[in-house]
Amino acid sequence: MDMSGYRRPGRRLRSTRRLLGILAFALVVVGVGASSAAATKHAGGPATCSGTPGSPGVLSGTYSSNVTIEGVCAAVAGAAVIEGNLTLTPGSGLNAAFAAGSVTVQGNLSVGRGAFMYLGCIPRSFACFDDPNHEHPTLSSASTVEGNLSETQPLGVVVHNSTIGGNVQQTGGGGGTTCENPPPTFPFGVFSDYEDSRIGGSINVIGLNSCWLGLARDSVGRNVHILQDQLADPDAIEIIANQIGNNLVCQQNSMVWNSVETQEGANFPRVPLPNEARHRVGQCVLASPLSEGGPLGPGPF
C-alpha cells in the first residue's frame, strides 16, 4: 500500500485539513468500487472480506451476520451495513475513509493486534482518500458503530466524522515509541486519532506506544482516560476542544497538550483550545504551556 503522497496529521494536527495526496491504494480501490457500486444483500451467515494492499477486498452492501476482515479491505462502493459484529483479524486493515463508501456496524467493532483502520473523513480535519483536492477538500463520509469500538494492540486507528454508540477502548499497540522507519500504511509515523466524532460512552487509551495521538472536537458522553501512553512526537498528545460529559483523566503519559502551535515547524508559541469536562485529574488539570519553558495554567486544560 503506497501512501507516500500523504501527510501525517501528527506533528501538525491542523495539517490534516490539507491531508493526503492521491495514492496508488486509493486509485486501486476506487477502480474496484466503480465496478461493484450496486447495493448487495449478502447471503446469511458470517462473511469474510479479504484482499491484499495491491488488490483490496471491497466491503459493500448489507451483511446479515458478522463480518471478518482478513488482509486489506476498503469501503469504497456505497454503504456497507453489517447487522452483526465487524472484526479485523491480527495484521489486517480497513480503509473506510472514502467519500464513495461508508460503514455501519450494528454490533461491535474489534481491531486486532497489529491491525490498522481508517474510519470516516471530513474536510475540516481529514480529507477523504478519494477527494480530488486535498489542499481544499470538500467531500466527507460518516460511519457508525452502534456498539463498542475495541482495539487490542492495534498498529493505528484513525477515526473522523463517526458515531460510536458505546465505548472506545484502545489497549496497547502503536508500533513503538518512535516516528522512524514507519510502515507503508503510516508513511510519516504511526498514529492513532479520534476527531470530530460522537462517542456515547467513554474513550480509554491505555498503554499506547506510538509516534502521535490526538483527540479533537469529540463529544464524549462519559469519561476520557489517557493512561500510560508514550508518544515520540513532541507535539503529542493533543487533547483539544472536546466536550466530555464527566471526567478527563491523564496519568503517566508523555507530554499532553490542550493547545495547538501557531507556526508551521515549531511547537511554540501555542493557542489554547480547552476542553469541557466536569472534573480533571492528573496531567489534564491545568492548561499546557503556551510558550517554551512557560508554566502550566492558569486556565483549565
Report residues per predicted region.
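N-terminal secretory signal peptides that target proteins for export/translocation
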Residues: M1-T16
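N-terminal signal peptide c-region/cleavage motif recognized by signal peptidases
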Residues: A34-S36
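N-terminal segments that cap or nucleate solenoid repeat domains
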Residues: T40-G93, P295, G299-F301
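Feature marks extracellular polysaccharide-active and adherence modules
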Residues: E70, A77, E83, T89, ...
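Acidic/polar low-complexity surface segments
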Residues: G93-L94, V111-T144, N167-Y194, S210-L215, ...
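Leucine-rich solenoid repeat scaffolds
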Residues: A236-F301
